[in-house]
């Protein structure tokens, strides 16, 4: 039995994204990849950056509700962008997850991002395809 708070990536997240974009008449690209339409690409990029700025403001204010809203919007926009660009999100997710799980926890602040909260690539790490 599935816990009611756990949702399915395909049915819930990707299904919701599909319904949303279809409702407003946004069309998925026929070809896979970043479209030639620079206006669309620039809009989606700016949209993500706007939400990241909102998240930063929420964290600064210690506003949990606004932080959660911004994080969900970031995921929504990122998934929507992948959907519009016809990118193979589920396959990509699995590949990135596999690569991420082969990383190791940083042991000191002297690592790449200067914090022991980070995870780093071991010497034999392989990037996702």
Question: What spans do the regions from the language model cover?
Answer:
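Flexible "arm" and connector segments at domain edges
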Residues: 1-129
């Amino acid at each position: 039995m599935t816990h009611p708070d756990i949702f399915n990536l395909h049915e819930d997240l990707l299904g919701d994204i599909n319904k949303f974009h279809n409702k407003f008449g946004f069309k998925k690209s026929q070809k896979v990849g970043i479209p030639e339409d620079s206006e669309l690409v620039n809009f989606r990029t700016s949209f993500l950056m706007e939400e990241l700025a909102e998240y930063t403001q929420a964290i600064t204010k210690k506003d949990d509700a606004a932080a959660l809203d911004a994080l969900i919007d970031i995921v929504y926009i990122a998934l929507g962008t992948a959907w519009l660009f016809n990118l193979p999100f589920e396959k990509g997710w699995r590949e990135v997850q596999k690569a991420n799980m082969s990383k190791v926890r940083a042991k000191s602040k002297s690592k790449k991002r200067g914090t022991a909260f980070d995870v780093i690539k071991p010497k034999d790490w392989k990037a996702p395809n």
